Design a protein with these regions (language model features):
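N-terminal organellar transit peptides
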Residues: 1-130, 137-226
Length: 226
């Protein structure tokens, strides 16, 4: 193929641009004005797409950064205020997380409970500890085949003077009880079994999670997600 037949290559020669460099960086048949545009950053491109589709990726340890999910839920409910609940576009939360900050977890769970816009939680790899509680809190709960769930009572570390440690322990014991009561109310888990099993790490595969009411469906076709 004679590359010099292409106008862009002739322009490149006139400007002293190496032809091979030109071919490494542009597509043939694309106008010069378009070719000179910088391609969008893949991360930002996907971020914009997810924002438009109301998709949130709960990846990695749960921390204050994930309060963005609470903000997203609030924003979507504001946008949907004049739309009937059944006509609202749902929010989809894809989960792969080892768990994390219990206070952030509780904020997310309560945002889900307050949301009139439907929130679908989807386990696509692991939902451990706090992430398992968030998974179970969705208005609709899904999981891909081969995924994993782990529940336990959580762990805390306290520091400071004895009075401060006692105050912290009392507060977080109360918070853990609230979370436990909530999880038992949205799943089929037996309270006695939960109390016994959750002392240590209690693991579920996708079928166990379905049977226990942690999820509503195991997804076998991606058409069910989109």
């Amino acid at each position: 193929m004679d590359k010099d037949k292409y106008p862009m290559i002739k322009i490149a020669k006139q400007k002293g641009i190496n032809k091979m460099d030109m071919f490494d960086n542009v597509l043939l048949g694309v106008s010069e004005s378009v070719a000179n545009l910088q391609l969008p950053d893949p991360y930002l491109r996907n971020l914009y797409r997810d924002e438009e589709d109301r998709v949130y990726w709960l990846d990695g340890p749960i921390s204050e950064e994930n309060l963005d999910l609470v903000k997203m839920i609030m924003r979507c409910n504001r946008e949907d205020k004049r739309i009937r609940e059944e006509d609202r576009k749902p929010i989809k939360v894809f989960i792969d997380s080892p768990g994390g900050d219990v206070t952030v977890e509780w904020s997310i769970i309560n945002a889900i409970k307050c949301s009139k816009t439907k929130i679908i939680t989807i386990n696509y790899c692991t939902a451990f500890s706090a992430a398992a509680d968030i998974l179970a809190s969705g208005h609709e709960r899904l999981a891909l085949p081969g995924t994993h769930v782990m529940m336990h009572n959580g762990s805390c570390s306290y520091g400071g003077q004895s009075d401060a440690v006692e105050s912290q322990k009392k507060y977080f014991d109360g918070l853990n009880k609230k979370i436990t009561d909530h999880i038992l109310s949205v799943t089929k888990l037996n309270p006695r079994v939960y109390k016994k099993k959750a002392i240590t790490d209690w693991f579920f595969d996708e079928n166990d999670a379905l049977e226990s009411g942690i999820i509503d469906q195991v997804v076998t076709d991606f058409d069910d997600l989109y």
